[in-house]
Amino acid sequence: NGVLHRDVKPANIMLCEYGAKLSDFGLATVLGIGAAGSPKGYTTHLPPEYFTTRSTTELTDIFAVGITLFRACNYIADWDGTIRRLHNPIGLIQAGTLAQAIGYNVYIPLRLKKIINKAISAVPTQRYQSASEFRQSLERLRPGIDWHPSAAGSFEGICCTSGDHFRIELTSTSRSFNVDLKKNNRRQLQNCSSFNDMGEAYHFLHEHIASTLFT
């Protein structure tokens, strides 16, 4: 629609009963054909080409939305703190490799990672070329179970179609590490397993999360 927001970030996304709404258009501009906006934006959400051209385009917003989605799906609450712990964060931002340096949580499905990675590609021509193209890729994902961490080694979720409640958790004994899945407080034996190694148990748990986030 010719409007460039230039400040897409979690703080500017408002949640309501109808879904998510983008807010704070204080830096927004209307672009003409072939025009580019002035150098504005949230530094950590800017694409690498900005640091050489000092201009913003629709691809700048697409990159910023991709970074916002990356933060949301990985539950990164302390974004600034996460960046400060990285080696040479300014260099990573300017190279467009900040998200790659941080990495995804292991339970993020490959299909979602591919969509985000395309949106935040360091090469502008390899990104989605329009917001509608980006949206269409996301809409092809069919939500399965809406999982969220509830405690260390534990996730709870609601099935987006049936409303069933799920809980999966890792517990340990002196001899084993156990992953238990419950549906509406009933243990689902076919999805429970025991392991001698904690890493293998976590891998099993995270694989289940990743395989059920979308149908």
Which residue stretches match the model-derived regions?
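Conserved HRD-motif arginine in the catalytic loop of eukaryotic-like protein kinases
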Residues: 127
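Conserved catalytic-loop aspartate of Hanks-type protein kinases
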Residues: 61
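Catalytic-loop of the protein kinase fold
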Residues: 3-15
